[in-house]
Amino acid sequence: MAKLALIEREKKRARLAQKYAPKRAELKAIIDDASKSDEERYAARLELQQLPRNANPTRKRNRCAITGRPRGTFRKFGLARNKIREIAFRGEIPGLTKASW
């Protein structure tokens, strides 16, 4: 199981990304707008750089909701592959069955 601090750090990153999403979108729209002057676009770029680093959604890592495992996590369930297997065998995920062909 991952350390609790790592799990909390990811939660903090998710909160920051959500908090600053409108501001980031506004600044990025100004930067991409060719009709704006170069000074306005440059000022928007500087302001974007001043936002917290963890406000960038690309820094967020998907982790298992149970164990905090960073790899092998399925987005659909929010769980790591080994936990999905355990829970599915117990029949706790509706509609999920073991493949057989």
From Swiss-Prot:
| Residues that span the membrane, as ranges | none
Biological process, per Gene Ontology: translation
Q: Which UniProt keywords apply?
A: Ribonucleoprotein, Ribosomal protein, RNA-binding, rRNA-binding
Instruction: List the GO terms this entry assigns under cellular component, sorted alphabetically.
Output: cytoplasm; small ribosomal subunit
Q: What GO molecular functions are on record for this protein? A: rRNA binding; structural constituent of ribosome
How this chain assembles, per its entry, is: Part of the 30S ribosomal subunit. Contacts proteins S3 and S10.
**Family in the record:** Belongs to the universal ribosomal protein uS14 family.
HAMAP family membership: Ribosomal_uS14_1 (MF_00537)
The record's annotation in PANTHER family points to: 30S RIBOSOMAL PROTEIN S14, SMALL RIBOSOMAL SUBUNIT PROTEIN US14M
This molecule's function is given as: Binds 16S rRNA, required for the assembly of 30S particles and may also be responsible for determining the conformation of the 16S rRNA at the A site.
Q: What is this protein called?
A: Small ribosomal subunit protein uS14
Native species: Burkholderia mallei (strain ATCC 23344)
